[in-house]
Amino acid sequence: MKNKLAYICSPYRGNAYKRIRNIAYARHITRVALELGYTPIATHLYLPQILNDDIPAQRRRGLKAGKDILNTCGTIIIGAKYGISEGMASEIEAATGKDTIIII
């Protein structure tokens, strides 16, 4: 049986306006993934509620947790509408060999 877990990769950081926009976009991509039959995992929708993304040590911890979760997923879904952030580029590099879906 194919692994239907899909890691949602889209921007998060930015000023208050961009964060609101980016969170809405991540929710949209997550909804699309569900409609495509995937079980989506969007770590940037819940880890910032626990960790402070503006504190470098906590950001690194969150990025590592995300990559650990990414390793369990068969697919990465990339939301590229607002570009590829540094964090996204790192996740995309870590996802080499996984099925990839790009949503713009």
Predicted regions and their residues:
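Catalytic phosphate/metal-binding cores of nucleic-acid and nucleotide-processing enzymes, i.e., regions
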Residues: 1-104
